[in-house]
């Protein structure tokens, strides 16, 4: 759900926590139905795009109710220091890939339905439930030709070069 709220108001955090309770219950039911052994979690983020800002993971509704000042500040201003007035509460999807011994995710660019590029976003200190779009992230391009250069556990494609500094 999209929530119009001020994260600094305890009454608005209560509304978000209630939504989190409902969503986590629905997800737990689906996880059980599909024999998923992981515990569901949520992501609370700005509805106005993030660039990695204004995003936190939520494991329980109490995480929202008990947000400390630092996390409330993180969720109160977004891109260009504009106030965040709408937050999205959505299912968290853990990263399942590991590249160069780091948790990684594929980032794909598409144009008119065709994939035109992409890369791995990796982070040396984050877990599979963390947001990888954060300070310290590393980028690696997909292989263009031979898999001899691959350093990925993914057999379909891997890593050719470090593009973090390009």
Question: Where do the language-model regions lie?
Answer:
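Conserved N-proximal alpha/beta basic substrate-recognition cap immediately N-terminal to
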Residues: 1-38
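A near-ubiquitous, low-amplitude feature marking generic local secondary-structure context
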Residues: 2-10, 47-51, 72
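Generic low-polarity alpha-helical segments
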Residues: 5-6, 89, 160
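Generic detection of long, well-ordered alpha-helical segments
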Residues: 10-21, 61, 153, 157, ...
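Serine/threonine-rich low-complexity intrinsically disordered regions
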Residues: 19, 68, 127, 145, ...
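Phosphate-binding site of ATP-dependent enzymes
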Residues: 25-28, 34-42, 48-142
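Conserved catalytic alpha/beta cores of large enzymes that bind or transform nucleotide phosphates
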Residues: 135-166
């Amino acid at each position: 759900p999209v929530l119009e709220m001020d994260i600094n108001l305890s009454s608005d955090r209560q509304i978000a926590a209630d939504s989190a309770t409902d969503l986590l219950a629905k997800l737990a039911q689906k996880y059980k139905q599909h024999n998923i052994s992981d515990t569901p979690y949520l992501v609370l983020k700005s509805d106005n795009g993030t660039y990695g800002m204004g995003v936190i993971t939520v494991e329980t509704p109490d995480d929202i109710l008990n947000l400390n000042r630092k996390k409330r500040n993180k969720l109160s201003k977004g891109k260009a220091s504009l106030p965040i007035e709408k937050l999205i509460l959505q299912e968290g999807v853990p990263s399942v890939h590991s590249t160069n011994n780091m948790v990684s995710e594929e980032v794909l660019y598409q144009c008119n339905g065709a994939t035109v590029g992409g890369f791995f976003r990796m982070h040396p200190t984050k877990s599979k439930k963390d947001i990888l779009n954060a300070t310290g992230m590393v980028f690696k391009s997909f292989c263009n030709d031979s898999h001899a250069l691959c350093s990925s556990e993914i057999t379909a494609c891997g890593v050719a070069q470090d593009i973090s500094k390009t």
